[in-house]
């Protein structure tokens, strides 16, 4: 279809036709009957019936009937229908078949003088009478012989009708019949009187033949099975790899086309070379893989054309159409005098067949008749179309090119085109290149067979080159197909040419071929292959000549030169293709340089073939760039050198030959710069000076070294040599720090600096940061027989916050420590978990020392107090698994001296005691009831701590056990009154401000050091020693600077995926090409590290890493040197043991390619194969510990707000304003939710401590802890607030009341709504619920009864006024009940008070609405009864504990304004209602 641009190009000459029709050699004038088409479309098919009428189908699906007028100079065209995609005429049955746009087929008989196209004469054919296809059968093509018809479906399936010899007979209706093999695509179909010819191409068979990797589903979103489809880049979003694959698939399919024939008789019509009749379809093997691109058939002969311009014909010569009978395809020429004609007239662009003649369209646009009949003879000299004809862009018609020449009966039709004749030179020369490659393809295929079957190394080395040669051949075929379409004007934009729109893919393929060729040529591979061939029986004598084999593989280099010339011509008129021209020119230059280097390298190896020390470096992938023999270079030494030094610059390393020693320095880890008149060369293990004789020579060496380094790093030529690089290296055995360590990471002038990956000879692995060659910063270390550490390092040792998972082969226990380290030891706040206990608290030099909480997982006992030297020492409290509570002074892990003991049955003791029983003077109280009478108070957890009990008392010298207390010297008195709890209770517990001191100190120290670590050098070890250090004092500006650096580091560690920091490090590491071994035994050599595959990162996922089997804490303490040596990389696991437990080895998962790859070019130096996938579970896993939401104050995470990305300006002045308070609250709300912010981290750590202290109860906790937990939480909140004040100095030190409002600002009002999360509140609530269980049990029983009663019954049972029932029916009352239910979902005091106040307000509105008729106001007499009813309907669980906890949270001056106002009144009313409800048990009235 012509585009709008084409219309404008017509320039008002719309009467111009897009095709010309000839009859018996004369051009006819076309007359359009009726309204002629506004836009002329080319013809796609013509056929003539028996009456001499011509049927013409155009590309716009219009079918015309054309009749020759009597004067034989004019032809009338009449439109029949506009929905036809294909048509053909069967001369035997006199029927016209048309394929419609909807895929259906209709036929019409045209004999007996009937007019073609009568609307009522069409008959629709059925292809699926049984309706087996859900969507029906869609036909796209029809082809007719004299008696038979073949239909082709949209999916390539074929149907037959009529008769064709023994193949199919007398089919009255279409029948499905497979005419060609499965897995092939039908490209074209032609028919004579008694035979059919099919052109087919294979589907994607190129994957195996060309060794192509199968593209992923993402790269191929659409079905591309049809291998010859267009892949124009203008309509493709595939990746480069996918485009390359499709290019080669298209070329492979076009090259490996096949011809199939079948017919009623043979007589040479089938091209089989004989006259034997065939009862089935036959393949013409002679034309296999010849690149046949089009076919045409006359009544008794057939013509085929190939992409390289060759023609073949066969058939009968009854009418002199062939010159002689030809029963097998024979190549023909256009003219006998080819040399005298221009080259455009010497190549056939298209061939077609009339009934008994063959017409050719040459590249000049001239029609030639091949031995034409006399009436057509003058066409041989004429019919060259004008250059001003309409240009057409067919779009969907390409690449199945529209036929430019068609014949039927005595008519010939030529679709007019304006050929791109200025580019014919390139078309013809590419055809010549294809002919040459096809001519020598047998030799290549012979080498391929030998290469696969022979074990000879010279032949095996040809494998990559042979594959690349086949790829270039397929690429050339696809290129010719594209260029021919452009030349014929099937498309007119040069951007649609494959070698332009896919120039990157083309250059990659040619670059691959160039490399494969140079790899073979540089090591004399062709000569060695010829020598190997001489021992084989070669069917081709030329393969015994090295010159022939070399020329054979040099031939493809002529192809891209034509592309360069084409681009040079193109940019003269269309400068927008300058980028493509530059790309092709640069590639041509680089290819020439590569070939020149290959020649030089071959000469170098030839001249040194008797030097074994040099020959060992000989490899296909290595080139010789420069030698000191060519350009002198010598080593600068301080003394007199006794041996001479020579240098050889290879493409991947610099070789130094010194006497009997030989050294190699990989270019990826080589730094070079000018130093005076010399050159300074620096490697990870050595730095030395070299000099030249002149400045020019020094520049040559400097330029070659720098360009070689750039090339080895994979950077574009001309890039500056980077001082920072990401590459790999294996240190030699002599290196003092990293002996035999394989390192891959960021380097700066020979020193590791940045993110790195280290693998040690004993299997230890480190992944993380290094500073100036020292492990310092954040990282992960896996140590066989010792454990796994993730955290901060300093000076090569654990330092700062980290997680250390220890394991031991001989111990079944597991142990994980998370906390602070100092100089490789547990020091500061930490959490130790193993199978026997959990400890949370302070450490000093690997020992528990200071305040801590330890829970015995075996016995269930919990201790909260002071430690010294791993033992309980100092004041503390112990809670047993029975719920007994001990408080006093501990020494040597036992309770000694005076203390108190409160037992689960409400007995208690004051005096000298141990954990086992009384031990000296003391008093033992045994209550039997409360002072009010009855024993109901026993064990109920009465909420009134001052309640007095009645019971017996023992005092004096007491002994025995707690089960049997004995009086040694004392008295037993009966029925005495005494308080419920000991008077000295709580006097010997650790001060709440002393608890978790190290946690806050470590937090502030880590925050202060995060900026110091970025600016300090690797050798600075002054900070962080085991000596007690002063608490860092930072100004407000310094704190904000530390917060910014901290958040930046946290985000960098997390990367794009949470917990994937180490994966991102490995993904950022280089993947250089694998190199062969230059020195397999000399460990002083170094070269490029082999590929580090990204699959290794899967084992570095910190959050998903399970713990290992480890040694106990006691075993660790028995070996203090294990974490205290000067270099933790040596101390942690670098032992001599080789008997490692692979099942529990903490290691990295590396794939097989990494295991087998080389380091420093040593093929025997592979990565440790013991690195296997870690996949066993443990209850103490790090992942569970890090993601324990129960321990989290703020379990929700959110994206970083813009508020956190800048230093705030509010809260910094001396005066605090309401706007400051609002902004501070907004900032803190975001900070406590953002996992990158230090406040979030502080929250997480302190929440863990609080939960370990007052959570994890296996039995009902003692109510004594309720008040202690509340006071401890207040202390924690106050210390968090103290740090927040450093961020916002305007905040008050204690509290203040805002001017103009009653709002109080303090740590409670500011932080409780943010940090008092579900986890903390739930922990406190459990303690309070146990303490206030008596009233809540009564409350629960009354709720159960009230739930069963109707509203009226409940009012009567409670003894309230009956009119309150009307209030309960009001919707506001129901809303009040629902609001009060929200109390159990709130955690902060302010939110809880708001819920209570809102519920009371709705209750008031319900009363006023219900009593509106009486205009009654709600008073105190009715408020409490209504509140009781609301409470019983809301049924908030453990309401007594909720109210008591709220009472403690709102105590003090912080909520004085609220408690003195409406919120306090509502709270007091609810509390009073609760007391009324629980004062007695409700009983249903009978």
UniProtKB/Swiss-Prot annotation:
One cellular-component annotation, GO: cytoplasm
Q: Where is the VPS9 domain?
A: 1333-1486
The RCC1 repeats are found at: 147-201, 256-307, 308-363
MORN repeat spans: 744-765, 766-784, 789-804, 817-832, 839-853, 863-884
> What does gene deletion cause?
Deterioration of locomotion in adults with climbing ability strongly depressed.
Q: In which tissues is it expressed?
A: In the embryo, expressed in a wide range of tissues including the epidermis and the ventral nerve cord.
User: InterPro entries from the entry?
Assistant: Alsin_GEFs/MotNeuronReg, MORN, RCC1/BLIP-II, Reg_chr_condens, VPS9, VPS9_dom_sf
UniProt KW keywords = GTPase activation, Guanine-nucleotide releasing factor, Repeat
Q: Which Pfam families does the record associate with it?
A: Alsin_RLD, DH_alsin, MORN, PH_alsin, VPS9
Give GO terms: molecular function aspect only: GTPase activator activity; guanyl-nucleotide exchange factor activity; small GTPase binding
| Superkingdom to which the source organism belongs | Eukaryota
- Can you cite a GO biological process for this protein? early endosome to late endosome transport
General function of this protein: Has guanine nucleotide exchange factor (GEF) activity towards Rab5. Promotes the exchange of GDP to GTP, converting inactive GDP-bound Rab5 into its active GTP-bound form.
Annotated protein name in UniProt: Alsin homolog
User: Species name for this entry?
Assistant: Drosophila melanogaster
Q: What is the lineage of its organism?
A: Eukaryota, Metazoa, Ecdysozoa, Arthropoda, Hexapoda
Q: Which gene encodes it?
A: Als2
């Amino acid at each position: 279809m012509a585009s709008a641009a084409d219309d404008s190009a017509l320039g008002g000459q719309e009467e111009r036709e897009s095709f010309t029709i000839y009859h018996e050699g004369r051009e006819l004038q076309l007359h359009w009957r009726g309204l002629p088409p506004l836009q002329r479309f080319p013809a796609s098919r013509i056929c003539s019936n028996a009456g001499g009428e011509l049927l013409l189908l155009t590309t716009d699906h219009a079918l015309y009937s054309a009749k020759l007028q009597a004067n034989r100079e004019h032809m009338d065209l009449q439109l029949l229908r506009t929905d036809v995609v294909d048509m053909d005429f069967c001369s035997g049955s006199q029927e016209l078949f048309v394929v419609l746009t909807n895929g259906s087929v209709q036929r019409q008989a045209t004999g007996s003088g009937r007019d073609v196209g009568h609307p009522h004469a069409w008959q629709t054919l059925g292809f699926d009478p049984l309706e087996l296809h859900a969507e029906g059968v869609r036909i796209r093509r029809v082809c007719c012989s004299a008696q038979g018809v073949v239909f082709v479906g949209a999916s390539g399936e074929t149907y037959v009708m009529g008769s064709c010899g023994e193949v199919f007979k007398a089919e009255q209706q279409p029948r499905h019949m497979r005419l060609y093999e499965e897995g092939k695509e039908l490209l074209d179909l032609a028919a004579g009187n008694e035979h059919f010819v099919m052109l087919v191409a294979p589907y994607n068979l190129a994957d195996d033949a060309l060794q192509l990797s199968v593209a992923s589903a993402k790269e191929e979103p659409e079905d591309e099975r049809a291998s010859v489809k267009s892949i124009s880049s203008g309509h493709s979003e595939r990746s480069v790899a996918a485009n390359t694959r499709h290019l080669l698939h298209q070329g492979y399919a076009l090259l490996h086309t096949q011809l199939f024939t079948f017919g009623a008789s043979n007589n040479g019509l089938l091209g089989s070379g004989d006259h034997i009749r065939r009862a089935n379809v036959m393949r013409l093997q002679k034309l296999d893989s010849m690149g046949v691109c089009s076919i045409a058939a006359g009544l008794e002969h057939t013509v085929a054309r190939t992409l390289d311009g060759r023609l073949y014909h066969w058939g009968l010569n009854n009418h002199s159409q062939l010159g002689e009978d030809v029963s097998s395809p024979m190549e023909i020429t256009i003219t006998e005098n080819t040399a005298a004609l221009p080259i455009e007239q010497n190549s056939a662009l298209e061939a077609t067949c009339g009934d008994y003649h063959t017409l050719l369209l040459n590249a000049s646009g001239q029609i030639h008749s091949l031995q034409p009949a006399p009436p057509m003879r003058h066409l041989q000299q004429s019919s060259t179309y004008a250059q001003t004809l309409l240009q057409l862009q067919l779009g969907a018609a390409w690449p199945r090119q529209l036929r430019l020449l068609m014949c039927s009966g005595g008519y010939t039709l030529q679709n007019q085109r304006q050929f791109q004749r200025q580019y014919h030179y390139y078309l013809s020369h590419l055809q010549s290149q294809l002919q040459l490659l096809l001519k020598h393809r047998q030799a290549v295929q012979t080498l391929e067979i030998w290469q696969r079957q022979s074990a000879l190394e010279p032949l095996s080395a040809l494998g990559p080159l042979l594959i690349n040669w086949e790829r270039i051949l397929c690429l050339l075929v696809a290129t010719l197909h594209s260029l021919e379409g452009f030349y014929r004007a099937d498309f007119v934009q040069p951007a649609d040419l494959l070698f332009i729109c896919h120039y990157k893919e083309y250059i990659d393929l040619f670059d691959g071929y160039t490399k494969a060729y140079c790899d073979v040529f540089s090591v004399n591979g062709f000569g060695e292959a010829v020598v190997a061939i001489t021992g084989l029986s070669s069917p081709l004598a030329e393969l015994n000549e090295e010159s022939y084999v070399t020329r054979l593989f040099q031939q493809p280099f002529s192809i891209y030169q034509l592309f360069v010339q084409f681009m040079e011509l193109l940019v003269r008129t269309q400068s927008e293709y300058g980028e493509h021209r530059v790309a092709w020119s640069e590639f041509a230059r680089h290819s020439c340089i590569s070939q020149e280097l290959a020649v030089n390298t071959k000469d170098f190896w030839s001249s040194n073939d008797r030097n074994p020390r040099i020959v060992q470096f000989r490899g296909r992938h290595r080139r010789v760039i420069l030698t000191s023999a060519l350009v002198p270079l010598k080593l600068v030494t301080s003394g007199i050198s006794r041996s001479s030094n020579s240098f050889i610059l290879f493409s991947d390393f610099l070789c130094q030959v010194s006497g009997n020693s030989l050294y190699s320095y990989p270019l990826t880890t080589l730094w070079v710069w000018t130093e005076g008149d010399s050159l300074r060369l620096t490697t990870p293990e050595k730095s030395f000076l070299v000099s030249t004789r002149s400045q020019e020579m020094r520049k040559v060496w400097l330029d070659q070294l720098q360009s070689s380094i750039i090339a080895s790093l994979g950077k574009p030529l001309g890039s500056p040599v980077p001082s920072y690089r990401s590459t790999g290296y294996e240190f030699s055995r002599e290196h003092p720090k990293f002996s035999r360590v394989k390192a891959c990471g960021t380097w700066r002038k020979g020193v590791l600096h940045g993110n790195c990956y280290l693998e040690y000879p004993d299997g230890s692995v480190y992944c993380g940061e290094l500073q100036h060659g020292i492990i310092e910063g954040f990282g992960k270390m896996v140590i066989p027989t010792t454990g796994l550490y993730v955290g901060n390092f300093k000076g090569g040792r654990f330092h700062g916050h980290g997680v250390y998972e220890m394991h031991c082969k001989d111990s079944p226990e597991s142990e994980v420590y998370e906390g602070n380290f100092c100089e490789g030891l547990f020091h500061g706040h930490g959490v130790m978990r193993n199978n026997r206990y959990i400890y949370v608290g302070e450490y000093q030099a690997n020992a528990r020392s200071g305040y801590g909480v330890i829970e015995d997982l075996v016995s269930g006992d919990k201790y909260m107090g002071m430690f010294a030297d791993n033992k309980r020492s100092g004041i503390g409290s112990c809670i047993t698994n029975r719920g007994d509570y001990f408080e006093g002074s501990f020494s040597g892990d036992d309770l000694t001296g005076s203390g108190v003991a409160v037992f689960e049955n409400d007995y208690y003791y004051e005096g000298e005691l141990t954990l086992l029983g009384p031990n000296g003077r003391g008093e033992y109280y045994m209550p039997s009831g409360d002072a009010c009478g009855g024993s109901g108070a026993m064990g109920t957890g009465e909420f009134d701590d001052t309640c007095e009990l009645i019971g017996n008392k023992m005092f004096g010298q007491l002994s025995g056990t707690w089960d049997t207390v004995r009086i040694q010297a004392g008295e037993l008195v009966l029925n005495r009154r005494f308080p419920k709890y000991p008077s000295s209770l709580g006097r010997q517990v650790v001060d709440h401000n002393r608890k978790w001191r190290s946690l806050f100190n470590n937090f502030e120290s880590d925050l202060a050091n995060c900026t110091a670590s970025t600016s300090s050098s690797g050798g600075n070890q002054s900070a962080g020693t085991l000596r007690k250090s002063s608490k860092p004092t930072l100004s407000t500006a310094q704190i904000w600077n530390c917060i910014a650096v901290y958040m930046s580091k946290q985000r960098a560690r997390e990367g794009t995926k949470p917990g994937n920091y180490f994966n991102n490090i490995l993904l950022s590491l280089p993947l250089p090409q694998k190199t062969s071994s230059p020195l397999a035994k000399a460990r002083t050599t170094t070269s490029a590290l082999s590929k580090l595959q990204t699959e290794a990162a899967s084992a570095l996922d910190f959050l998903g890493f399970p713990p290992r089997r480890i040694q106990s804490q006691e075993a660790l303490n028995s070996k203090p040197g294990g974490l205290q040596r000067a270099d933790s990389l040596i101390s942690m696991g670098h032992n001599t043991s080789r008997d490692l437990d692979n099942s529990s080895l903490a290691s990295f998962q590396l794939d097989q390619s990494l295991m087998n790859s080389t380091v420093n070019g040593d093929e025997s130096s592979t990565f440790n194969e013991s690195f296997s996938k870690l996949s066993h579970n443990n209850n103490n896993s790090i992942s569970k510990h890090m993601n324990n939401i129960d321990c989290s104050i703020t379990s929700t995470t959110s994206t970083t707000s813009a508020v956190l990305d800048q230093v705030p300006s509010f809260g910094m002045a001396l005066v605090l304003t309401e706007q400051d308070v609002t902004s501070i609250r907004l900032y803190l709300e975001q900070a406590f939710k953002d996992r990158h912010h230090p406040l979030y981290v502080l929250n997480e750590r302190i929440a863990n401590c609080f939960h370990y202290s007052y959570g994890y109860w296996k039995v009902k906790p003692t109510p004594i802890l309720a008040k202690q937990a509340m006071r401890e939480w207040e202390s924690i909140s106050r210390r968090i607030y103290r740090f927040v004040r450093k961020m916002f100095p305007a905040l008050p030190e204690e509290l203040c009341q805002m001017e103009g409002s009653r709002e109080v600002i303090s740590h409670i009002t500011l932080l409780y709504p943010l940090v008092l999360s579900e986890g903390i509140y739930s922990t406190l609530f459990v303690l309070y619920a146990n303490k206030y269980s008596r009233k809540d049990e009564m409350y629960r029983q009354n709720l159960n009864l009230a739930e069963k009663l109707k509203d009226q019954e409940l009012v009567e049972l409670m003894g309230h006024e009956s009119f309150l029932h009307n209030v309960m029916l009001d919707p506001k009352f129901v809303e009040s009940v629902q609001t009060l239910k929200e109390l159990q979902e709130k955690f902060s005091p302010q939110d809880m008070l708001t819920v209570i106040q809102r519920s009371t307000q709705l209750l008031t509105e319900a009363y006023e609405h219900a009593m509106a008729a009486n205009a009654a106001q709600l008073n105190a007499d009715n408020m409490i009864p209504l509140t009781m009813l609301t409470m019983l309907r809301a049924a908030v669980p453990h309401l007594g504990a909720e109210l008591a906890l709220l009472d403690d949270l709102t105590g003090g001056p912080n909520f004085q304004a609220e408690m003195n106002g409406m919120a306090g009144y509502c709270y007091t009313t609810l509390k009073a209602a609760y007391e009324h409800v629980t004062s007695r048990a409700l009983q249903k009235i009978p």
